[in-house]
């Protein structure tokens, strides 16, 4: 009985050592999963990051909340100024005298460095302008000029934004457009695995920085704005957003440095796409499309277009159709992608356990002898005889620790 009990204690100790080893291995980079988040400008990469932070309960501090509030106010004003400028370009005249006055007020307003909030008068002008029929005519032709996808959200929530005690909600933060400049890294742990999600600005002038992020990447997440098939770029109004995205995807996935890197294609803004496809045919972007307004057919066609950009025909492409503004979509996508990554890196996990067995074999034998002598002090461990059944599970990747 004493010998059996001692063996159980040694097994428990080995399992404990394994857990500590894997955690340490993660800290040292052995289980450091670096994931590169790429995509053209305004594809929704930053929204994906915000949702991951929420899922892993990474708190937004007061300074960040304040920054979000400031950007919400600035975005709201910018969106109406863009609409008014587009109306002039398109030759759509504002016929109502009151509307003209409000338009002049909004167009002439500028945020000064010390001004962090739009005045109530400007906010009310914007709210009334959004209701105007001529402004809606401009909005109906939004495929002809650059705009923010969240434009209606800002205008529909403007009363709340104007409140003196306004604090952005989680949805407000998700919907806030903050242009990514430089390189942003979001880190979180899951078990012994340390994830680093690297987000780099998607605008053309930011892409030269991407090369600095290409080393030691475990996976590529390429985010696409589905609604971009009927939108133009901020940097170049003559260029279609989706065509730009396709070109960029081809350049990235065919780079030799990523020949063995798992690639995930995230077709984002599905909610907007489902609305747009009913009004604007996909053939506007792809003349060879013949599927009409059927959402499923259109999504499969777009997915095929991206698949065709991969020169290695046998390279798998894992694809998701989502709306990143909804946490459940990101949670599902992340769980699926994470499972694939851990499965493909199972050899690393197994090597970690193999190294541990070698280093702990001698200490286990000596522990067995010492534990036998102290048998009478260890009666409370009898119920642990089947602990872990010789396995430890790391998010679906099972590592055996017994020969």
From Swiss-Prot:
Biased composition regions of type Low complexity, renumbered to the chain: 374-389
Single GO biological process annotation from the record: positive regulation of sporulation
Covalently attached lipid (N-myristoyl glycine), positions: 2
Disulfide bond positions: none
G5 motif as annotated region, ranges: 322-327
Pfam families in the cross-refs: G-alpha
Record note on quaternary structure: G proteins are composed of 3 units; alpha, beta and gamma. The alpha chain contains the guanine nucleotide binding site.
Name used for this protein in its record: Guanine nucleotide-binding protein alpha-8 subunit
Gene that this polypeptide is encoded by: gpaH
């Amino acid at each position: 009985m004493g010998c059996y009990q001692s063996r159980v204690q040694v097994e428990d100790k080995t399992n404990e050592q394994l857990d500590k080893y894997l955690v340490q291995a993660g800290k040292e980079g052995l289980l450091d999963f670096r994931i590169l988040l790429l995509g053209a400008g305004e594809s929704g990469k930053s929204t994906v990051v915000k949702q991951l932070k929420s899922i892993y309960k990474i708190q937004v501090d007061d300074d960040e909340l304040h920054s979000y509030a400031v950007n919400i106010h600035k975005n709201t004003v910018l969106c109406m100024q863009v609409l008014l400028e587009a109306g002039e370009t398109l030759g759509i005249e504002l016929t109502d005298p009151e509307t003209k006055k409000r338009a002049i007020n909004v167009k002439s307003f500028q945020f000064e460095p010390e001004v962090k909030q739009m005045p109530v008068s400007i906010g009310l002008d914007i709210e009334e302008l959004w209701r105007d029929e001529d402004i809606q005519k401009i909005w109906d032709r939004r495929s002809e000029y650059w705009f923010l996808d969240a434009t209606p959200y800002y205008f529909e929530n403007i009363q709340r934004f104007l409140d003196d005690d306004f604090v952005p909600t989680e949805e407000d933060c998700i919907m806030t457009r903050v242009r990514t400049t430089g390189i942003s890294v979001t880190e979180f742990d899951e078990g012994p695995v340390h994830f680093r999600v690297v987000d780099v600005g998607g605008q053309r002038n930011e892409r030269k920085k991407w090369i600095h992020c290409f080393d030691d990447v475990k996976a590529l997440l390429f985010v696409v704005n589905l609604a971009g098939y009927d939108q133009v770029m901020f940097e170049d109004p003559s260029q279609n957003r989706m065509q730009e995205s396709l070109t960029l995807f081809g350049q990235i996935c065919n780079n030799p440095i990523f020949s063995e890197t798992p690639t995930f294609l995230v077709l984002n803004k599905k909610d907007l796409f489902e609305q747009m496809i009913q009004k604007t045919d996909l053939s506007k972007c792809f003349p060879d499309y013949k599927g009409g307004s059927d959402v499923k057919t259109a999504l499969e066609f777009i997915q095929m277009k991206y698949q065709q950009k991969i020169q290695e025909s046998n390279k798998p492409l894992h694809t998701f159709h989502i709306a990143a503004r909804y946490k459940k979509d990101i949670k599902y996508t992340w769980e699926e992608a994470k499972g694939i990554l851990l499965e493909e890196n199972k050899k690393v996990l197994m090597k970690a356990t193999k190294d541990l067995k070698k280093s702990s074999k001698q200490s286990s034998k000596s522990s067995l002898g010492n534990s036998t002598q102290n048998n009478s002090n260890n009666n409370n461990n009898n119920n642990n005889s089947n602990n872990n059944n010789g396995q430890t599970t790391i998010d679906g990747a099972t590592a055996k620790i017994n020969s």
